Amino acid sequence: MSDARTIHLDQPSRSRIVPTSWILGLLTGSLLIVIAMMGWADLGMDFLKASNAKYLLALMLLAAIRYILRYQSSGWQRVARDFCEYVGLFLFISLLGATATYPAAAATSGFADAALARIDAMLGFDWVRWYMLVVDNPWLQIAGSLAYANIYMSPVLLLGGLALSGERARAQLFLVSFWLAALITMLLFLAMPAVGPLAYVWQGPIPYMPTSALYQAELLPLLRDNMLGAVDLGALQGLVCAPSFHTAAAVIYIAMAWQCRYLRWPLLVINGAMLLSTPVEGTHYLVDMIGGAMVGLFALCTAGAIQYSLPKIRASRQWRETRIWQNLTSSSSAAVPPAVQSRDG
């Protein structure tokens, strides 16, 4: 591994690193908004409950390691510092995004399943046939459930690789893209709540209950009627049908891993399997996945555009500060009268 990748010597990449204070400010603002949403929806959270406290303790541990190693700039200490920072931020974004869907669900009304199923029919996608393929092959049920759970395996591998190579700018690009995809997904969810094809399309007894089960159909009415009461971080369920966040995440994972030859093909296989499992395990329409892919691409492009504009923003800011300083110094010089030499001197 070259020194340019191990140590932050690439000046263009360094100039695209987002100040940590900006990211913390962004996440703090997001947290305050979610807290306000929870209050509006009459939802609480008991942090003394073990299922909630374990995530809080994990975040505190990662933050503590990051703080202790804050001055390390080489060796395994730097890798550990960066990895803890990246994983901590990813965990915070994931928990915050999933939690936000609960008060967001309380603000929804109606269901978009009829329109989504109609679009699937126009696309020629038969969800029931796809589901029956899994029902008739038990090994697909096991493989599908494992593949669907890989939404949390890919980022650990990806962020670990970026921490090892010292590519801080790319790690931040991934995190900002993931945050932006979560935000867009939640906003679209407000306009397109749905219970999913298992609840809407399937008729009769359910021969195989996938990972996402019937949570949308069960939880959305409770949240709309303010009957849930509290959110449990240890029992968070996917409430968003359209667009598919698993698909958005897979697009981001694959795109970010494509530049790393050690992770490119493993993550392509892992996320390809996750995408194949999404219609059944996530109870998604095909149009959900198309929408999710578009969300992932848009988030990547937007975050990339912001990051690539940072050098220009910094240069413009530096130019303005220089001009202000020059004006101040020139003004102060003009205000001081020139020294008059004494005749005796």
How does the language model describe each region?
Residues 81-90, 156-193, 197-207:
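Interfacial segments of alpha-helical transmembrane regions
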Residues 157-164, 247-264, 294-305:
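Membrane-interfacial alpha-helical segments at the cytosolic side of multi-pass membrane proteins
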Residues 14-58, 80, 84-155, 331:
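N-terminal transmembrane-helix/juxtamembrane module of multi-pass inner/ER membrane proteins
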Residues 140-154, 237-258, 286, 290:
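Membrane-interface loop-to-helix entry segments
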Residues 187, 191-259:
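Membrane-interfacial catalytic/cofactor-binding modules of polytopic membrane enzymes
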Residues 30-38, 94, 182-189, 272-280:
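Aromatic-anchored segments of alpha-helical transmembrane domains
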Residues 196-199, 241, 272-299:
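Interfacial helix-loop-helix junctions of multi-pass membrane proteins
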Residues 1-17:
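Short, Lys/Arg-rich, polar N-terminal cytosolic tail immediately upstream
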